[in-house]
Amino acid sequence: AMDYATPAEQIIQASPRHRARKLMTTMSEKGFSHIPVREEGAIRGVFSISSVFDYVRRYPDRGLTEDTRVADFAEFLPVENHGERFLFAGPELTYWEAREAFGQVYKHRRLAVIFLTEDGSKTGRLLGMLTPWDVLGLDEEITAEEMVQPAQ
């Protein structure tokens, strides 16, 4: 699965002190929907569209100012508090295991991201990140390539 993952050095990562609106602008410009929030080397949570939505819904009077930090979303960042699911796996995860994981729905929650870490835990060193598009989108690409191959 590592062959299909976005390598850690190419993943936008945040810390609790990052400005939320600036991060949201970057996410929008780059087309990212989930940003790992790291502190002391470990993934402490995920900043996402649903984090922002939950924050605004819970605290409608606070708004999002230039001074709003990722830390202000603290209660909505832990992977356990998301409406989506996140999986942590080691580098030995295969493409087919990742594909199967993305195809499953658990308690009405879809798998949004697989974080590949050195030891398969959220405290392990981040190696890469897989999204459903990284894995499930390959079938369409392969089919499209096969369709344009000249007949033998």
PLM feature spans:
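Acidic (E/D-rich), amphipathic helical modules within compact regulatory domains
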Residues: Q13, K22-T68
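The feature marks the first
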Residues: A5-A8, A14-R17, R21
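Short, flexible active-site loop motifs that bind/organize anionic cofactors or intermediates
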Residues: Q10-Q13, A42, F88, R125
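A glycine-centered beta-loop-beta connector
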Residues: M27, I35-V52, F102, Y106, ...
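Tandem CBS (Bateman) regulatory domains
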Residues: A1-Q10, S48-L111, T131-Q152
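Well-ordered alpha-helical segments embedded in enzymatic catalytic cores
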Residues: R19-K22, T26, E97-A101
